[in-house]
Amino acid sequence: MFTMNRIRSFKAGHWIIIGAVIIVILIVAVVANQYNDSTTSKSKRSVISTADSFQYKCKSDAESLLCMEQQYKTFTKNHGVPTAFTKLKAAYAIDPSVKTYCHQLSHVIGRTEADMVKNVDEAYSKGDNFCWSGYYHGVMESIVVKIGAKNLPAKLPTICAAIKAQKPYSFYHYNCVHGLGHGVMDVTDSNLFASLKMCDLLSNAWEKESCYGGVFMENEMDEVNPDHHSNYLKADQPMYPCTVVEQQYKYQCYLMQTSHALRVANYDFAKVFTECSNIETNYIEVCYQSLGRDASGNSSSNVDKTKANCMLGANSDAQTNCIVGAVKDFVSYYHSDKQANDLCLSLDNSLQQICQTTKAQYYKTF
């Protein structure tokens, strides 16, 4: 059974766990919206077009992301970060295609701003956490690309030093070092193994783990982004590359991997529960928790659907850990404990206590 002592302490991994939930929500959001909302009706698009004069000149197909990215890049250059986020938030509320690619579009706003300023601090001062902190990840991508592959090994440990000094182990510190993971994937041409080794140059285990999470997340995003490709995800081996990476990378890998496993299993949660049960013993619980995050993310944190998918676990250990992952995702999705409480109250008594305890502890971090 799941026990609370398996949750990492704040200093050892507090924001790593938060980041794992938050960053992977975006993977689930992309997949869930592509799976459930592949098109937008003509009538709805007409209404949206009136609300936003530039956003919907893009086609509603795989090319739409590239088109929207260019629009937000230009808009951010011309009007600044706050106005770009105002536009993005309005579009997010009414169109599934924007919801699908919201994190990527936030990356674009961050990259664009970072290209125009001198350093991380200046770019971060204008940031917005909307859509799972994509802005900050985009900033770091730009910063790393500016430094370049040749100079990066020497400079990598110092890039987030100022933020670390101001707010050590904070969410901002986490976003900085997690964003480095995105950035090193950029400069290594999405070489996952080389990128993980680059993360090992950081100063402590917490920063390294946060960076690993960025690498594995970028690998997942390479699979769903139309202008990228991952060489490290296999349809016939749904838990690859977690099965082959070195031991220190496995936790972060399995914390991301069920999003890919669900895609190749056509969202058969029962099948992926079984796949989780067959991996290395030390990582079975985190795999179940990853499925809980996906159960929430695939349903936009709908109580009944999330509960139903978690109850597909074959035993109490699988179901309990799924609920742990799900309730964290509810808190992250809503930035509130109200909806998470609704999930907990919907459960049998045997699951309510761990759900409520996890919810309360996790909500304190926000």
Positions of the model-derived regions?
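Non-catalytic tandem-repeat scaffold regions and their flanking low-complexity/translocation tails
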Residues: 17, 29-366
